[in-house]
């Protein structure tokens, strides 16, 4: 007990392995390492989303929807990292932190370019999470269950939502009123639906219900109407 008391509040010397916590039991070191690597990736993703928020929040951009979405996306990624770190600590593990690199791209030509980077980033997160799940599946049933129930559905939902947005932007284009209308719709969606990390999928009914009627043509096609503006 005295030995343990002396270790409270003290970090292990550089290059030395941390002392195992009393709660640690059958927590595979390979799974622990994979968890920590994914935590770093989530924090980098949060940093990336935060840089997008800063870009679109400038007065020369004033993209309300994008700023709200990017701020929320940054928050969600940071919260996922926190939940995973808390899980590692609950299992008696140790989170070894390292530097987070600055985002390679800090400016975007248009919304389509920005969402392309968002989708690519989210796919990297999903690939890492799937690799982590496969690592844990054969080594630690509790870890794999945590990933499947607490993480996987959330990331897949985010990927689907961002991909749907990108597909709509392909149709709308980057000229005219289209991007402005999309940004205003995005602002409403973020405020009305993104109240928890489980992001709902984007549907045509959602899109149409948040756009003024005058932006639809006679046949009810919003994309075609926007191109005429």
Curated annotation (Swiss-Prot):
Stretches assigned to the Ferritin-like diiron domain: 25-173
Keyword presence, Ribonucleoprotein: no
Keywords tagged on the record: Acetylation, Iron, Iron storage, Metal-binding, RNA-binding
SUPFAM superfamilies: Ferritin-like
Gene Ontology biological process terms from the UniProt entry: intracellular iron ion homeostasis; iron ion transport
Residues where N-acetylalanine is found: 1
GO molecular function: ferric iron binding; ferrous iron binding; RNA binding
GO CC terms, sorted: cytoplasm
InterPro entries with a match to the protein in the record: Ferritin, Ferritin-like, Ferritin-like_diiron, Ferritin-like_SF, Ferritin_DPS_dom
Family: Belongs to the ferritin family.
Miscellaneous remark of the record: Artemin is elongation factor-associated and self-associating.
Listed name of the protein: Artemin
Lineage of source species: Eukaryota, Metazoa, Ecdysozoa, Arthropoda, Crustacea
């Amino acid at each position: 007990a005295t030995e343990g008391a002396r270790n409270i509040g003290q970090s292990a010397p550089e290059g030395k392995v941390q002392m195992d916590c009393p709660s640690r039991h059958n927590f595979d070191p390979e799974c622990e390492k994979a968890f920590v690597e994914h935590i770093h990736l989530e924090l980098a993703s949060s940093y990336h989303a935060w840089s997008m928020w800063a870009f679109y929040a400038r007065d020369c951009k004033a993209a309300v929807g994008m700023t709200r979405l990017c701020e929320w996306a940054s928050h969600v990624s940071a919260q996922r990292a926190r939940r995973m770190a808390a899980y590692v600590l609950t299992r008696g593990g140790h989170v070894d932190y390292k530097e987070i690199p600055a985002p390679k791209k800090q400016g975007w030509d248009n919304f389509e370019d920005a969402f392309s980077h968002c989708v690519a980033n989210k796919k990297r997160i999903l690939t890492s999470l799937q690799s982590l799940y496969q690592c844990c599946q054969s080594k630690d049933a509790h870890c794999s269950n945590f990933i499947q129930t607490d993480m996987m559905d959330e990331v897949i939902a985010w990927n689907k939502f961002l991909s749907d947005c990108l597909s709509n932007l392909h149709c709308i284009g980057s000229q005219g009123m289209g991007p402005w209308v999309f940004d205003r719709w995005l602002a409403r969606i973020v405020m009305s639906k993104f109240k928890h990390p489980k992001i709902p999928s984007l549907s045509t009914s959602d899109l149409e219900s948040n756009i003024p009627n005058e932006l639809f043509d006679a046949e009810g096609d919003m994309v075609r109407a926007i191109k005429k503006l």
